[in-house]
Swiss-Prot record:
Keywords: Cell inner membrane, Cell membrane, Ion channel, Ion transport, Membrane, Metal-binding, Sodium, Transmembrane, Transmembrane helix, Transport. The gene is fluC. This is Fluoride-specific ion channel FluC. It comes from the Bacteria. The keyword Cytoplasm does not apply. Na(+) is not transported, but it plays an essential structural role and its presence is essential for fluoride channel function. It catalyses: fluoride(in) = fluoride(out). It comes from Azotobacter vinelandii (strain DJ / ATCC BAA-1303). GO terms for cellular component: plasma membrane. The keyword Protein transport does not apply.
Length: 124
């Protein structure tokens, strides 16, 4: 069990670092679009979780440490619902309600579509 715990910790650290780097890069290039980094990592994370889920269904022999490290660790560290919620609130507070609701809808629908697309990729 220590191997699984370590895999989740390492995966989480790597996912957090990638999210942090993505956020910094997008903020440096498009500071007015602060929410784009959260949207990007959440949609990418949904695509990856759909793909990994499909792969793990096809390959049940994949070790638990690898599955947990990638899904609970890496994708758990990469994606973030709390940042998504804060970004939406900031848009609403700044009087950008149409953008806030567009962001909300695209995040949810885009996330579902990306997860489905990731699962479909395993069948190609």
């Amino acid at each position: 069990m220590i191997g699984v715990t370590l895999a989740v910790a390492v995966g989480g650290a790597l996912g957090c670092l990638l999210r942090f780097a993505t956020s910094n890069w997008i903020s440096a290039h498009w500071p007015q679009h602060f929410y784009a980094a959260t949207l990007a990592v959440n949609i990418a994370g949904c695509l990856l979780i759909g793909y990994l889920y499909g792969q793990f269904l096809l390959r049940p022999e994949v070790p638990l440490a690898l599955r947990a490290g990638l899904i609970a660790g890496f994708l758990g560290g990469l994606t973030t619902f709390s940042s998504f919620s804060l970004d939406t609130l900031r848009l609403l507070e700044s009087g950008q309600a149409p953008l806030a609701f567009s962001y909300l809808a695209f995040s949810v629908l885009g996330g579902l579509l990306a997860t489905w697309a990731g699962l479909i990729l395993t069948k190609l």
